[in-house]
């Protein structure tokens, strides 16, 4: 179990929908500090969160997840002045725009990776940090393909690949930072939007999706926090239909373990 009591949490996402509902649940867990980094101001949401737990300090910064890493460093230098340290980093920024592949990939994958690369040194035990947990909020179509939202699905597959790679013991044994992902199923805030398919052949399906049964943002947010509390390094969870399910990970390339062992053995030989 991962105890959130007293933790300093940094949430990178728009403070609405799933992110807002997740933050509401976090505020009931006696966290000490919550930093929210999002693209637009939402003072009503911040006030709503603060009313749940007045003793928890909430900080807000406008943040563009697609900015260059050099700019991110400036932001997080400022964030650390207020936060002192980060125990939990949650990446929740998302975009589904099949007409704008670059923006979709930059928001969902590249921006998330740059954010993680920027924050990791602050959390790394060998660099003066205390370790902690990185949570990548992603989608079930990062596990199974979507013939309708091809660009979105590709970006979410990338999130899963990045999560599993960064969670490898090669890193975790040294930096003490666990990495996990939560894959959300169809959720009301997503399907309420006007959705465009990657190719016109899939548009009728995209239109019908808006009428499909979906989980609420509040239930999804609750299960994201449940997954965090139950998390172990490298785990992938599915939050869908009001439930929470642990993904059984599978290795398709059977030489993967041997290859990593070979690289580690060569490193040890070089040190000798």
Curated annotation (Swiss-Prot):
<dbReference type="InterPro" id="IPR002427">
    <property type="entry name" value="ADH-rel"/>
</dbReference>
<comment type="similarity">
    <text>Belongs to the short-chain dehydrogenases/reductases (SDR) family.</text>
</comment>
<dbReference type="InterPro" id="IPR020904">
    <property type="entry name" value="Sc_DH/Rdtase_CS"/>
</dbReference>
<keyword id="KW-0560">Oxidoreductase</keyword>
<protein>
    <recommendedName>
        <fullName>Alcohol dehydrogenase-related 31 kDa protein</fullName>
    </recommendedName>
</protein>
<dbReference type="InterPro" id="IPR002347">
    <property type="entry name" value="SDR_fam"/>
</dbReference>
<dbReference type="Pfam" id="PF00106">
    <property type="entry name" value="adh_short"/>
</dbReference>
<feature type="binding site">
    <location>
        <begin position="11"/>
        <end position="34"/>
    </location>
    <ligand>
        <name>NAD(+)</name>
    </ligand>
</feature>
<dbReference type="GO" id="GO:0005737">
    <property type="term" value="C:cytoplasm"/>
</dbReference>
<dbReference type="InterPro" id="IPR036291">
    <property type="entry name" value="NAD(P)-bd_dom_sf"/>
</dbReference>
<feature type="binding site">
    <location>
        <position position="139"/>
    </location>
    <ligand>
        <name>substrate</name>
    </ligand>
</feature>
<dbReference type="GO" id="GO:0016491">
    <property type="term" value="F:oxidoreductase activity"/>
</dbReference>
<feature type="active site" description="Proton acceptor">
    <location>
        <position position="152"/>
    </location>
</feature>
